[in-house]
Structures are given as C-alpha cells and as structure tokens.
C-alpha cells in the first residue's frame, strides 16, 4: 500500500470571499451553524456557538453553504486549547477527533441537544425527564481503534494512524491522546517496525483491541509474511510486554494468533463479579470505563426484581446479559449471529461459580434470531418478559418495535396484526408486553425513529433519556432511553 505523497498536498484556495458570521449552534458533525440575513444556512468548520468569525465559503448549494473558520473576532468561553498537536484545520490534521477545541462539558451539552432534537424532529417524542449524562475520562479512553498503514516509497517512511481530516490520506501521527498511553507510545516504534518489514508495501491496517491487561494488534497482510517479518513481529512483542500479534491474511474468519499460549483478552465488570473474554475482532465497547458505568446504570433503570424474566435483545457476548443474570429469575439473550450465541454460552459458563463463595447466575439461555426480520409471531414465541434491554447496532431495532406495537394494537382493538406471513389474530395466551424497556443506542436518529413507533402506538411513553459520552472529542452520540408501558 504505497502513497507517493507524505502529507505534502496543498489546500485548494477558497472560491468565495470571506464573510463575517455569528455562530448559533453546532450540528451533528461538530460544525458551527450560522444563518445569512436571507435565512440561508452556513456550516462552518472549527467555529463554536456564540462566536463571531470570519469564514471562507468553499462550497455553495441552493439551500446551504460550507465554510471553514479563518479568524475569530469573538471567542466562546467554552473554547479550549486542543491537547493533541495533530488536531486542527491545518493541512494534514488528523480526522479522528472533531471537538478537542470545545470544553468536554460543553461537548456533552451539545450531544444532549442532538439527542433531544432527534427524538422530537424524527420521532415526535419528548422524554418526561432527562438523565444525568454518563461521563468518564476524556483522554486515553479508546481501547479499540482501526489504524491505517501507508508505506511512502519516496521517503522510505511509514505512516500509522487515523485518516486525515476529510481525506483518504493517513495522518502523519507520532502520538494520540485518545488511545491508552502505552498505545500512543508505540506509534513511532510501529512505524519503524513496519518500515523494516519485507511486506511493508502490502500492510493496509492494524486493528487495535485492548483488554484490561492485554493489548492485541491484528495485522492485515495482503501477502504471506516472510520468516524474517514474523521474527520482527515477535521481537516487537517481546519489547512491549502485554502485546500480542494476530494475523489476518483474508476475511475476519482468517484471523489467528501469531503464537498460541498467550493470555486471553478480557475485561471485567467488577460490580457484578463478571469477567468477559473476547477476541480482537469481536464487538466490545470502545470505552471500558464508560461501559462499566453504562451497564450499572442500565440495570438500575430496569430495576429488575428477583422474580422477573428479562430479555436482552442484540445481546452480543453477554455484556448486559450476564449482569442481568445476577439479579433476575431468568434471562434470555437474543443475537443475530450463531457464532456469537456460542461465545455467549461459553462466557456464561466461565462466569458460573464452581463453588458457593458467591451466588450462581440465574437460568440463562441464548438463541440466534434475525432481529431485522422480527414479526409479532416471533415475539410471542420468545415468551413473555417483564423487562427488556435493547442494545442494537446503528441500524436500530425498527422491526422489533414495530412488532411490539402491532401486538399492543391487537390486544387493545382485537384487530389482527400482520405477523409477516398471514393476516390473522395471534393466540397470545398469557403473553403481555414488557412493563419497561431500556434502550441503549449508538445512533440518535434510529433511536428516535424506534421511539416514535412505540410512543405513537400508545403502548409506551418515554420517561427518561440522556447521553453517554462514550467517545469524547468526537461527534458520536451514544444514548440511553427508558420506555414505560401504560
């Protein structure tokens, strides 16, 4: 993977004269929003709310314009000096962060507004109350990352890091403040390692995954590695204790350890006495500090009682399922992947105490189900549950909530719901909808859409909603919402 340029490309000169504008707010991409006298919207990179700035417009459309801040005439009290020298609007700036120039408390406020705006404008939903934001360390939090690799033949140099802002080029990074310190300290040695490898031109990326005590790096290689390269990787691991190399010659199913017999990756949920083993290609939360607080908060919001049955939808490896098994009578974890279901079962068995030193986990079952093709009949088949925990990917849980709303309508009106195959009344027996749902979301737009389905049906109201600052200094909005039946 060669690149004949080492961040020496120039910025295209602006096509329009600068304008002085007053910034009103930030959008979901952390761009300042201003309006011209005629009402036309201008999105300004690098500008903050309440600032008065000179902005260079570089793109004009009929309904909006794009600009970049050139000078600040009135500065926001929330503007701070970025911690990282690679952050900014300059040529070659890293695109991994978007908000380092904004105080972290103000970042959370912006994300809260984004959540509320999405709930209202997309779902026509307004939460009864706002949750206190879940916050944690602002730096060194990112335990998962995909680092791009580029060999620059003319310079005989290697770049390892995130992409440049608004570019496919790899940023010339020597440090990173959002990954753990020991990973940041490895960036320059990694560049030197790869520059000396025989396969340096065919190594496109490194997938980073940190556990509590082990750091895994998955090296994607497009051709077989020489014995010399394997020896170089092993020597690098020896010089960086706790590091293990995984190799990926093809798709995800090709990932394997360079050397067996090393400690497994895992993270702890100490409040619940749970240890979660995982592989570097598994989905785990990027921010382990926030994850611990999020799991604790979600279970408190569910308020699970010892006699209750709970379903954990999109359960993954059991991040919420196993803690739920410490307090519920019975738990059902449902996931789309058969492989993940098998791994969840393994994690459950590993955490089931062999002695009486602590309480056993409750009866827990894991099943595979295509959650993007849910029907009312499938919901009834999974049985009644007192509470639900829903933690979907960015696509959300639309079919799940649509099926739940349809069953509610059948119960209220007696009109048959569409079970996806035939139009007929389902025999519900003693099935009833869950009394409470806690929804953990990584996309406020799909959360708002799904919330609208529930609330419009008349079955539920949104009692609580709030943000989870899982990704400080980025525009990513993680959130949590609570829905109460009746």
Curated annotation (Swiss-Prot):
Entry binding sites for S-adenosyl-L-methionine: 285, 314, 319, 335, 370, 391
Keywords carried by this UniProt record: 4Fe-4S, Iron, Iron-sulfur, Metal-binding, Methyltransferase, rRNA processing, S-adenosyl-L-methionine, Transferase
Lineage: superkingdom: Bacteria
The keyword 4Fe-4S is annotated on this UniProt entry: yes
Location of the TRAM domain: 10-71
EC category name: transferase
Catalytic activity: uridine(1939) in 23S rRNA + S-adenosyl-L-methionine = 5-methyluridine(1939) in 23S rRNA + S-adenosyl-L-homocysteine + H(+)
Active site as annotated: 442 (nucleophile)
This enzyme's EC code(s): 2.1.1.190
GO biological process: rRNA base methylation
InterPro entries documented for this protein: 23S_rRNA_MeTrfase_RlmD (IPR001566), MeTrfase_TrmA_CS (IPR030391), NA-bd_OB-fold (IPR012340), SAM-dependent_MTases_sf (IPR029063), U5_MeTrfase_fam (IPR010280)
PANTHER family named in the record: 23S RRNA (URACIL(1939)-C(5))-METHYLTRANSFERASE RLMD, RNA M5U METHYLTRANSFERASE
HAMAP family linked to this entry: 23SrRNA_methyltr_RlmD (MF_01010)
Main function: Catalyzes the formation of 5-methyl-uridine at position 1939 (m5U1939) in 23S rRNA.
Family: Belongs to the class I-like SAM-binding methyltransferase superfamily. RNA M5U methyltransferase family. RlmD subfamily.
The name this protein goes by in its record: 23S rRNA (uracil(1939)-C(5))-methyltransferase RlmD
Naturally occurring in which organism (per UniProt): Polaromonas sp. (strain JS666 / ATCC BAA-500)
Lineage: Bacteria, Pseudomonadati, Pseudomonadota, Betaproteobacteria, Burkholderiales
